[in-house]
A protein has these predicted regions:
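Short amphipathic alpha-helix with an adjacent loop that forms part of the alpha/beta core around
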Residues: 197-207
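Glycine-rich beta-strand-centered segment in the early N-terminal region that forms part
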Residues: 23-40, 50-93
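Short, glycine/polar-rich helix-capping loops at beta-to-alpha or helix-loop-helix junctions
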Residues: 94-96, 173-180, 245-250
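Mid-domain Rossmann-like dinucleotide-binding core that forms the NAD(H)/NADP(H) cofactor-binding site
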Residues: 119-195
Length: 329
């Protein structure tokens, strides 16, 4: 049985993504064969591709997908052929039509959650959960800054923060994205290319700044976050969309008001299969209750992954994106 797999032989731009027909064997003990119905696109995929997060080559790409089980290996008792499942890692290689994958890295997808929502929202939803509830521990009435508030994680952050009672200030790059952030619940939206973000934040908060800044943009917004965050406030740097922040002078944190900084990663908060299973169930419940909703702004053919990477890195996307294997409706 031949399946289509994306792979990279070297790091670089989107053009390094190659496609190959690879024979798929029967699942090994502890594995299942999962056929993808939708694959999630995440910024971490670009970091693996461009070498910011090094991996041994050659390697696959992609961490997040949803689909159905086609075969079950020996020793697997939790899953059956036909089950609807999703995964968000830690195994990389989701850019494919089907693959054999460890059974304990899968989560059941409820019947009322579409495969596209599961593929687009599981990793981002779990990221949002740990950022808000366990890393920053956001409290009601806090003022919170969300950079890239119309992005995949950004929109979920806005909704989750409103759910816990925070006042949300979002930054975006266009008027179209500003409207999307407001529709998600943002109390105020700032166009960071046209307005002084830190000054606007200070004005909106009576001069004090925000208790928490969620910054997934990185290099371009780091100084904004430093200046917009309140005394003894927290900057949560969870991504590098514009490039990594480096050479940080710790004395600056004192000068800006004894600030705290965290650089968390998903798999330190979802460290084992039990934690990942509990988190997935919680996030699916939040979708089911309507606390958070997915905005899937782009759908690409699976083999157009390179173009999807170009659009994501150029900030042309809105909300989340999915890659759809050929023949899937």
């Amino acid at each position: 049985m031949m399946e289509r797999f994306a792979q990279i032989q070297r790091t670089g731009g989107p053009g390094v993504i190659e496609w190959a027909d690879v024979p798929l064997t029967e699942p090994a003990p502890g594995e299942v064969r999962m056929r993808n119905l939708a694959v999630g696109l995440n910024f971490i995929d670009t970091y693996h591709r461009n070498g910011l997060y090094p991996m041994a080559k050659p390697c696959g790409l992609g961490m997040e997908a949803a689909g159905i089980i086609e075969a079950v290996g020996d020793g697997v008792s939790d899953w059956q052929v036909g089950d609807r499942v999703a995964t968000f890692g830690p195994t990389i290689g989701a850019y494919c039509t089907a693959r054999n994958i460890a059974a304990n890295s899968l989560f059941g997808v409820p019947d009322d959650i579409s495969h596209e929502v599961a593929a687009a929202g599981l990793l981002k939803g779990c990221t949002t959960e740990f950022l808000v509830e366990r890393c920053a521990k956001v409290q009601p009435q806090w003022d919170v800054l969300v950079h890239a508030a119309a992005g995949g994680v950004g929109l979920l952050l806005v909704q989750w923060l409103k759910h816990v009672g925070a006042r949300v200030i979002g930054t975006v790059s266009t008027d179209e994205k500003a409207a999307l952030a407001r529709a998600a619940g943002a109390d105020h939206v700032i166009l960071y290319g046209k307005e002084d973000v830190a000054r606007q934040v200070r004005e909106l908060t009576g001069g004090k700044g925000v208790e928490v800044s969620f910054d997934g943009v990185g290099l371009e917004t780091w100084e904004m976050s430093l200046t917009a965050t309140a005394r003894r406030g927290l900057i949560v740097s969870y991504g590098n969309a514009s490039g990594p922040v480096s050479g940080v002078n710790l004395a600056t944190l004192a000068q800006k008001g004894s600030l705290y900084v965290s650089r968390p990663t998903l798999f330190d908060y979802y460290h084992n299969p039990a934690e990942r299973a509990a988190g997935a169930e919680y996030v699916f419940d939040m979708f089911r209750q309507g606390v958070i909703e997915m905005t899937i702004g782009q759908r690409y053919a699976l083999e157009d992954a390179a173009q999807a990477h170009r659009d994501l890195e150029a900030r042309k996307t809105i909300g989340s994106s999915v890659l759809i294997p050929s023949g899937i409706k």
